[in-house]
Amino acid sequence: MGAVWLSHVSQLVCGCYLIEQSSCVLRTFHWSLSHSLNFTLTMKPKRRRLGVKMESFSLATPNMCFRKVSSELDSSFNGENVVCGLELEEKTAGDRNRIHFLEERNEETLSKRLRKLSRLDKVRSALELFDSMRFLGLQPNAHACNSFLSCLLRNGDIQKAFTVFEFMRKKENVTGHTYSLMLKAVAEVKGCESALRMFRELEREPKRRSCFDVVLYNTAISLCGRINNVYETERIWRVMKGDGHIGTEITYSLLVSIFVRCGRSELALDVYDEMVNNKISLREDAMYAMISACTKEEKWDLALKIFQSMLKKGMKPNLVACNTLINSLGKAGKVGLVFKVYSVLKSLGHKPDEYTWNALLTALYKANRYEDVLQLFDMIRSENLCCLNEYLYNTAMVSCQKLGYWEKAVKLLYEMEGSGLTVSTSSYNLVISACEKSRKSKVALLVYEHMAQRDCKPNTFTYLSLVRSCIWGSLWDEVEDILKKVEPDVSLYNAAIHGMCLRREFKFAKELYVKMREMGLEPDGKTRAMMLQNLKKHQK
């Protein structure tokens, strides 16, 4: 027999014999005792196994307790103290793994076995094989180590996972996948911020950075997305491009989703341009995000293009995507395209909801088709196509305001109140404005009084509309009462003076102008011009 090289081992058990050994080398023994000779002659080759009991990895990296890893992860990651700096604790003797005598010594073959055991989640068998290879000086390849590392993490054995990682690091057997797995482990134990700190420390060392690949960058970007760290996401994306890495479908989908979710739609569009240049397609979820980004950036043509590409690929855009696209096209005044998308929405089997109808009403309103807005609203209401909300009522009332349909506006207001919906100040303002346009000053005042009775607080726009309405109705006392009730507001005085000059009530205009100056309010240029132009005429 040749020499079998071992590290320091306190006890060796061969069959039923216990041999105390303190040296590093166990050489061939010449058995002098007869029972020893008989044992040697009768030993079967299949049972040639060194029953060396030892603690897993206790030769160079003792077992550790991971419950104190948090304090270490708070410090900077320097590669040397990820594992060694942790507080180590000896485990009980009952938790010892067995080192097997391996007949096979081919590292590639053993690596394949380790990969197979790891994929089957045979944790104990994989651990014994890994220990045995390491004990005999054999090194699994990086693929096998990563597979084993992933197996340990899947089964929650974080302690051994960090030990294996330290072994790989010392043997310079790490890859980008290795770092990716460990970033995920750190994120689970300590949080995403700690994992990102570890990533930044890795970036600072060129030797480690040479192992970076797209998978690792994807992991770091994903961690940023978990905590909505848009600035770090953008930085990692720029660094990845600077290193010459081309993103994958996952990379661009992550970037688009994060940027849209964090309100950086302009960056999402930049990502999309880069993706198109690299001839990479987005995933379905990222396409939804891009349609949303295009809506915010008023890129309706790009949103429509993405929507059409989804249909060509056999995808079924959801109702939210259809509504978003309709809204985008409606804001651009593309009414024809709006109703084409609506037809597609129906063909996909979606049932239009209140957002769909509001987008359609808004599209008609943007196209100045106010009569069509009211006609569609009446159809929605009469056929109970959806539950009417404040937005639908307001869209109808603003169309009434544009057309001067004060009666219909008042009717919709009372209907809205009767339905139990909360009527906002803006809704009352629309009705008062409709009365103003129709020269129904007294009706406007009644709506204002009704508004006050319902404890709805008026705003500056309410008073502006009331002042203009009362001036056109020659209700000068009411104008004066309104100005007395509210806090001094330069816009109200300017509007009142403009109206009075237009109605040729220069006396009242001059009184308001003097009062305005006494209160320290600064008139605008139009007010000054009107007063200078008509002051002499009024004095005569």
From Swiss-Prot:
NCBIfam families listed in its UniProt record: PPR (TIGR00756)
Keyword Repeat attributed: yes
Q: Which Pfam families match?
A: PPR, PPR_2
Q: Which organism is it from?
A: Arabidopsis thaliana (Mouse-ear cress)
Give the protein's recorded name. Pentatricopeptide repeat-containing protein At3g29290
PANTHER family xref list: OS03G0856100 PROTEIN, OS12G0638900 PROTEIN
Instruction: From the UniProt record, list the PPR repeat ranges.
Output: 106-140, 141-175, 177-205, 213-247, 248-282, 283-317, 318-352, 353-387, 389-423, 424-458, 459-487, 489-523
Keywords per UniProt: Repeat
Residue span of the signal peptide, if any? none
Domain of life (superkingdom): Eukaryota
Q: Which family does it belong to?
A: Belongs to the PPR family. P subfamily.
Lineage start? Eukaryota, Viridiplantae, Streptophyta, Embryophyta, Tracheophyta
DNA repair among keywords: no
Q: Which InterPro entries does this UniProt record tie to the protein? A: Pentatricopeptide_rpt, TPR-like_helical_dom_sf
